[in-house]
């Protein structure tokens, strides 16, 4: 009888490959905005540097439904949604990869902060940290880190 063996992908190698999936800046931002629309946001604001002296960072803020800590943690998991799962016709999401792959195709650090029922949650995928640790480690931010 065949023996089962778990074969976990090498974290920095796979994340590096996913970062190279060919997103343009515009399509990456559109993918993240689609998540805002799926969360019934009526307001989406895109923040980006306007001068060379500003830090190179893009922020996408919305007034969508938000996610609980548990739901946000799951949303930050690569492959968090089955391709066969039912979803709205106009929802671009299919495999639970878009937000992470789109965002990290343009940067080395993805932080998502969510507010749900007066509670804040935040997680960060940091490509450099994953390379250092050689593991799929996501960082949970403290309230103080969220405020900064």
Put a short name on every predicted segment.
Residues 22, 26-30, 69, 92, ...:
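Amphipathic alpha-helical transducer elements in NTP-driven molecular machines
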Residues 9-15, 68, 126-128, 142-145:
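General structural signal for secondary-structure boundaries
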Residues 9, 13-16, 62, 90, ...:
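Residue-level signal for pocket-adjacent positions within structured domains
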Residues 1-49, 70-74:
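Bergerat-fold GHKL ATPase/HATPase_c domain
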């Amino acid at each position: 009888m065949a023996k089962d063996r778990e074969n976990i992908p090498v974290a920095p190698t796979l994340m590096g490959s996913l970062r190279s999936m060919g997103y343009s800046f515009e399509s990456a931002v559109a993918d993240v905005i689609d998540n805002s629309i799926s969360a019934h946001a009526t307001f989406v604001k895109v923040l980006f540097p306007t001068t060379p002296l500003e830090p190179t960072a893009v922020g996408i803020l919305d007034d969508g439904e938000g996610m609980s800590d548990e739901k946000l943690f799951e949303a930050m998991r690569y492959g968090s949604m089955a391709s066969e799962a039912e979803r709205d016709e106009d929802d671009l999401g299919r495999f639970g990869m878009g937000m992470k792959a789109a965002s990290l195709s343009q940067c080395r650090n993805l932080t998502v902060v969510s507010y749900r029922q007066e509670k804040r949650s935040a997680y960060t995928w940091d490509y450099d940290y994953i390379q250092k640790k050689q593991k799929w480690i996501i960082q949970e931010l403290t309230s103080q880190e969220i405020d900064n």
